[in-house]
A protein has these predicted regions:
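Compositional signal for N-terminal targeting/processing segments
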Residues: 1-183
Length: 183
C-alpha cells in the first residue's frame, strides 16, 4: 500500500498538457522510450495501448517491447515464438509449465492483452525483452533489476523506440524505475 501511495504522491494530480493523436505520435517517435503504465486488469486501457502501438507501427516507428508480463526465465520461449519456432499455444504451455500464474493465461488479469502484445511484436518484427525477474525478488530489489534491464535494452537497441509496459506504480515514487533506468 505504501508503495502505491508513493507513486500517487510522485505522480501528483496536475494536468500537464493535452495533445491530439498526431502530436502524441510525433512526440513518441522522438523519444528513447514510451512508458505505458499498466493496470493489469484494465481492458479498456489495454485496448488503447494496442491502438497506440498499431498507429506507431503504421507511422514507421521501429519498436522494442519490454514487458513486465514476461519472466526473464521465459525469454528463450518468447524468442522462439517471435521467430516462428513456437505458436501461441506452445508458448502459453511453456510459460504455464514454469509458472501456473502466467500472465498469458491468468483470468484475474487481462491475459488476451498480454498475448496480443506478443502477437503484435511478432507481426511487426519487434524484439521483446522480459522485465519480470524470475525467480521473483522482493519489490525493492525487483525495481533495480527492472531499471537495469531497461538500460541494457537501450544500449542493445539504440535505434529503436523502447515501449515499456510496466505496472504504473513502478514508474515513479518508491520504485522510480523511469529515473533509475536513465532512459
Amino acid at each position: 500500500q505504501e508503495y502505491r501511495e508513493s507513486f500517487i504522491a510522485a505522480a501528483g494530480d496536475a494536468f500537464v498538457e493535452q495533445l491530439n493523436q498526431r502530436e502524441l505520435h510525433r512526440r513518441a517517435r522522438e523519444q528513447e522510450a514510451v512508458w505505458l503504465g499498466d493496470h493489469h486488469r484494465h481492458s479498456r486501457l489495454h485496448a488503447l495501448h494496442l491502438e497506440f502501438l498499431s498507429e506507431l507501427a503504421q507511422s514507421g516507428a521501429k519498436m522494442t517491447l519490454l514487458l513486465e508480463a514476461v519472466g526473464t526465465q521465459d525469454q528463450p520461449s518468447v524468442d522462439a515464438y517471435l521467430t516462428g519456432q513456437l505458436d501461441m499455444r506452445a508458448l502459453r504451455a511453456d510459460l504455464r509449465a514454469r509458472w501456473r500464474g502466467s500472465w498469458l493465461d491468468d483470468p484475474a488479469l487481462d491475459p488476451s492483452y498480454f498475448r496480443s502484445l506478443l502477437t503484435f511484436a511478432r507481426e511487426h518484427g519487434a524484439p521483446v525483452r522480459a522485465l519480470e525477474p524470475t525467480p521473483r525478488e522482493p519489490l525493492a530489489k525487483r525495481d533495480a533489476i527492472l531499471a537495469d534491464t531497461i538500460a541494457a535494452a537501450r544500449a542493445e537497441y539504440p535505434d529503436r523506440l523502447l515501449v515499456v509496459v510496466l505496472g504504473q506504480s513502478h514508474l515513479l515514487g518508491e520504485g522510480d524505475v523511469v529515473r533509475r533506468s536513465g532512459v
